[in-house]
Regions:
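Post-DEXD/H (motif II) to motif III coupling segment of the RecA-like Helicase ATP-binding lobe
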Residues: 70, 78-134
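Conserved small/polar residues in nucleotide/adenosyl-binding loops
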Residues: 174-176
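Conserved Walker A/P-loop ATP-binding site and its immediately adjacent core
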Residues: 1-15, 117
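Inter-lobe coupling/hinge segments of SF2-like helicase ATPases
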Residues: 85-88, 116-124, 138-163
């Protein structure tokens, strides 16, 4: 899934820069997830990526309470608002973080929130006691390309070889 690919890519980039980071997700084995969780709980991992569904698990919440987490970072924060609860209800449950962890900071990021959605996110996550930082959406480092498929294996290999050392996500209508 794009979320898992993004988590894997971001963790890989952090590790290449000697940042102690990991991720928990359903594409990993239970043993891998357990090993990573235990390492995080023992203080060996400084940044842990996980889905709202994994974070808002009561057993994990109880453990995290003992760890003194200083910062929660929420990506795709627009899912907390308006249409999010019907799509992924655990995003809306993230609004409980301010009560569960009153001494922790919360940062939320989205690229797709209008003014009303931003205000709703701020209210749900911080009771509007926060700083809003807005930036433009122009990202010269990002690109989107659509290719007609002819010989998809050769096209994919050529595409990847032309971009060695770069990060990216390839979306396909077929399972590769």
């Amino acid at each position: 899934s794009p979320l898992v690919a993004l988590m894997d890519d971001q963790v890989s980039a952090l590790k290449q820069n000697n940042v102690s980071a990991e991720r928990l997700h359903s594409h990993m084995t239970d043993a891998e997830n357990k090993e990573i969780w235990n390492s995080f709980c023992n203080g060996n991992i400084k940044i842990l990526y996980m889905s709202p569904e994994a974070l808002m698990n009561q057993n994990k919440i109880n453990v995290i309470k003992t760890l003194g987490i200083g910062l929660f970072v929420i990506d795709e924060a627009h899912c907390i608002s308006k249409w999010g609860p019907g799509f992924r209800k655990d995003y809306e449950a993230l609004s409980q973080l301010k009560e569960i962890f009153p001494n922790s900071n919360i940062s939320a990021f989205t690229a797709t929130a209008d003014k009303a959605t931003r205000e709703d996110i701020m209210e749900k996550l911080t009771n509007s006691n926060c700083e809003l930082v807005l930036q433009g959406f122009k990202r010269p480092n990002l690109s989107l390309s659509v290719y007609q498929k002819f010989n998809w294996k050769d096209q994919l290999l050529r595409f990847l070889s032309d971009r060695k050392g770069q990060a990216g996500i390839v979306l396909s209508l077929i399972h590769i």
